[in-house]
Amino acid sequence: MVATGGTFDELHIGHLALLTKAFEFGDKVIIGISSDEFASRVKNKKILRHNYEERVKNLRDMIEKRFGHVNYTIAKLDNEFGPTVTYGLVDALVASSETACKGEEINDIRRTNRMKPISIVAVDILKAEDGGPISSTRIRSGEIDASGKILSRTTKSE
């Protein structure tokens, strides 16, 4: 069983890459989605466009459209570790290269709880046309679209 997670506010091709790797790597996937409360405590997530229920629905719609009928469960995340530290059947974590470092913390907690360590699979952060990361934050701010296309350019005033 594979776990992955995120806030999944403005869905984009980076989320698609993460989910693609998770579904390639495991027969069953647990997808953690940050609760509204947890997301509001995380840097750059204070202003979400969608509440938890909307984010779940949007993600389910994307999964059905892109992957068809795959075996997955959605878990509400109230902390950064979610079911990876409590559910013994998780074998692997698929995470962005930005968050894969949490895998070692997860494995430390799992060892303390006498659970076997999990494999960590890192997915590279996808870059927008300008070379910056594709992220929900940049989509919310109107800089880029979900595929990384530049929507606005800031100009320096002289």
What are these regions (language model features)?
Residues 1-158:
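Nucleotidyltransferase catalytic core that binds NTPs
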